[in-house]
């Protein structure tokens, strides 16, 4: 029974990467869009809603697994949630390039070669509608 639960939860788990280099290489290798999510996991209410309503939905997770490489770029404020220094530096460098205005959440979509396709943020829509938004970029 426990094994079945472990397998079921791993199948529905969102595979979030935190390394840009790894995400870019995976997107290129698998010919998938790279979705970069700039978020403040412990202070940004719209970020938390996006996480809960879209990223954590079974529908989005199933679709993303087949079509996207997901990269989480977190900017926590609470000391207890602090990221390792190297992770912080990477996230800040990527924000300088892709999130110059400091919007949170910001969802940046790159093609499999790393070219910018577009960006969006939190929208009060269903997971299917959010998938359509990402695919329209």
Predicted regions and their residues:
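Bacterial Sec-dependent N-terminal signal peptides
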Residues: 1-15
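Thiol-based oxidoreductase modules, predominantly thioredoxin-like and allied folds used
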Residues: 16-17, 60-89
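A short beta-strand-turn-helix
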Residues: 17-34, 64
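Short active-site neighborhood of thiol/selenol oxidoreductases, capturing the structured segment around
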Residues: 30-44, 70
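Solvent-exposed loop/turn segments at secondary-structure junctions
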Residues: 41-44, 54, 75-79, 102, ...
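The canonical Cys-X-X-Cys-His
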Residues: 44-47, 107
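Typically the conserved alpha-helix immediately C-terminal to a functionally engaged Cys/Sec
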Residues: 47-65
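Non-catalytic, surface beta->alpha helical segment in thiol-disulfide oxidoreductase systems
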Residues: 96-97, 101-137
